[in-house]
Design a protein with these regions (language model features):
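Membrane-proximal helix-turn-helix segments that form the acceptor-binding/catalytic region
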Residues: 47-76, 84
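Conserved donor-binding/catalytic core segment of Leloir-type glycosyltransferases
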Residues: 107-127, 131-140, 146
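Nucleotide-activated donor-binding/catalytic signature segment of Leloir-type glycosyltransferases, i.e.
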Residues: 158-176
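Aromatic "clamp/platform" in nucleotide-sugar-dependent glycosyltransferases that forms part
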Residues: 196
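Short hydrophobic beta-strand element within catalytic cores of glycosyltransferases
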Residues: 213-217, 227
Length: 273
């Protein structure tokens, strides 16, 4: 890929698989993530591939294509240390990590802590919003949860809310516009973001830019590059009881949300272009 009918192409920046497979003499990698199902997710419930000969061949071919294409890059960057670590572990390559600000940087604001914890993201199993919903059964009755986003798990999550009798306390908001997203961050007590081994996770940065503490899990990956337990949020085991205990502490400790949120802002305020 060197030109199109309108203009020459002097630089190609690959981000996700398979974009970085494109061949170009001036190719740079800005790695968001690889095809994780044939790397770190292989052998977990989050991969579609098993140990059959056919699956093993697919894994081999994808990894072979990756290493060829990645070695063609003149410079390697990764979106977070977690993504860079996988590149080192599986491909033997080193990448620099300049953290990118979220798309709405400069527009986030803060407000007084509200009566809800906020979550945002795709409703799928790796984002683990079911964990937040189950944790609400362990949290004070006056605390609510509001979750923005859509995805394949929405119906299952709605069913879980009904099963646990949390219809009045947990709300799935679906897709929302930017202004409402900013408002929901600003008005929250804190932000839940505990996916499984996330590459980076803009939500953590968005929460801290809104001066809100983040509740994450010990196996959440990227968020752990920013969240320090008891300093700007909570890092807990991925269990309903542990998340519920963090929610309870946040909801019942006067001034804690503001203190942790302020420390979070200090942690990410320098992430700019």
């Amino acid at each position: 890929l060197q030109q199109d009918p309108r203009r020459p192409i002097d630089l190609v920046i690959g981000t996700k698989f398979p974009s970085y497979l494109i061949r170009h003499p001036n190719k740079v990698l800005w790695l968001v993530h690889q095809f994780r199902q044939v790397y770190d997710l292989l052998g977990t419930p989050y991969s579609d591939f098993g140990d059959s000969p056919e699956d093993r061949e697919i894994v081999r071919l994808v990894r072979e294509m990756d290493i060829r294409a990645l070695r063609e890059c003149r410079t390697l960057f990764a979106i977070a240390k977690n993504a860079a670590g996988r590149l080192r572990r599986f491909n033997g390559l080193e990448a620099q990590v300049p953290y990118p600000p979220p798309p709405l940087a400069g527009r986030y604001r803060t407000g007084a802590p509200g009566d809800y914890v906020f979550g945002a993201g795709r409703l799928d199993s790796m984002k683990r919003f079911d964990l937040l919903i189950r944790a609400m059964a362990h949290a004070p009755a006056e605390l609510r949860a509001r979750i923005a986003g859509d995805g394949p798990d929405r119906l299952a999550l709605e069913g879980l809310i009904d099963q646990l009798g949390l219809r009045g306390r947990v709300e799935l908001l679906g897709r929302i516009d930017d202004e409402r997203l900013i408002d929901l961050f600003a008005g929250s007590l804190g932000v839940y973001y505990a996916p499984y081994d996330e590459d980076f996770g803009y939500v953590t940065i968005e929460a801290f830019l809104s001066q809100k503490p983040v509740i994450t899990a010990a196996d959440s990956g990227g968020p752990l590059e920013f969240v320090s337990d008891g300093v700007n949020g909570f890092v807990v085991e991925p269990s309903p009881a542990a998340v519920g205990a963090a929610l309870t502490r946040l909801a019942t400790s006067s001034g804690l949300a503001q203190r942790l949120g302020g420390a979070g802002f200090d942690r990410v305020r320098g992430i700019t272009w």
